A protein has these predicted regions:
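Cyclophilin-like peptidyl-prolyl cis-trans isomerases
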Residues: 1-252
Length: 252
């Protein structure tokens, strides 16, 4: 018998948000439940709010933080391995996703231990989604080419040191060709499914975050509270001018 996805209730100073955590992302599910039971989230703030994008919380230094304090760096000293269940789970409006540090220091896209965001996003047109697919395909091709360069680094360096420019050009063209062929084979990875397209066109979300951050739950009640938080006034650092507090997180 299939075990039901666990439900948590996030009590905030603006109202309650009911969230389903996915059993398909057990590392994130268990980590969130553990922190909730320990009271880690009690008193923390939604410290970063961007209209038509998301609301973010979980900075462990945000509790009772002065209104002028810069927030966003507070965490628990460990990360949670990425759990991409794509395209089943994506950044539709109401998705619960894990914050993380950037690719340059975190190429594995591991998640923050405590920081999360809830997607608000916006509605997209077919033309905009088509353009995003092209951009995703270009990024995939570049990623593949970079990997091939790394795999052939010693040969490239030898040709470069020996001044063999023609051979270097031939090798580069060969790697570009291989990258294009692999991209063509993996084209489906950058295509939106019919379900994604329909939701992004009707309810909205943030499609360019897909396969970049781990989605591990979704709001099932209280989306109006999420929207209320999304629309508060913020300062130049996207911090609300009046503190929005997570008073507690209840399991079930």
């Amino acid at each position: 018998m299939e075990i039901q996805d666990p439900i948590i209730v996030m009590h905030t100073s603006l109202g309650n948000i009911r969230i389903k955590l996915y059993n398909d992302t057990p590392l994130h599910r268990d980590n969130f439940i553990k922190l909730a039971k320990e009271g880690t989230y009690n008193g923390l703030l939604f410290h970063r709010v961007i209209k038509e994008f998301m609301i973010q919380g979980g900075d462990v230094t945000s509790k009772d933080a002065p209104i002028n304090k810069q927030l966003g760096a507070g965490d628990l000293g460990y990360t949670v391995p990425a759990e991409f269940i794509y395209p089943r789970y994506f950044h539709k409006k109401g998705a619960l996703s894990a914050a993380r540090t950037g690719d340059e220091v975190n190429p594995e896209k591991a998640s923050s231990a405590s920081q999360f965001f809830i997607v608000t996003g916006k509605v997209y047109t077919d033309a905009e989604l088509n353009q995003m697919e092209k951009q995703k395909e270009a990024r995939l091709k570049q990623t593949i080419f970079n990997r091939l360069q790394t795999e052939n680094k010693s040969q490239i360096m030898n040709l470069y040191r020996n001044g063999e420019k023609d051979e270097l050009t031939i090798l580069k063209d060969t790697l570009i060709g291989k990258a294009e062929m692999e991209t063509e084979r993996r084209k489906d990875e950058v295509k939106f499914t019919p379900e994604q397209r329909e939701i992004y066109k009707s309810k909205g979300g943030v499609p360019f975050l897909d396969n970049e951050y781990t989605v591990y739950g979704e709001v099932i009640e209280g989306l109006d509270i999420v929207e209320k938080i999304e629309n508060v006034k913020t300062n130049s650092s996207d911090r609300p001018l009046e503190n929005i507090v997570i008073t507690s997180v209840e399991i079930g």
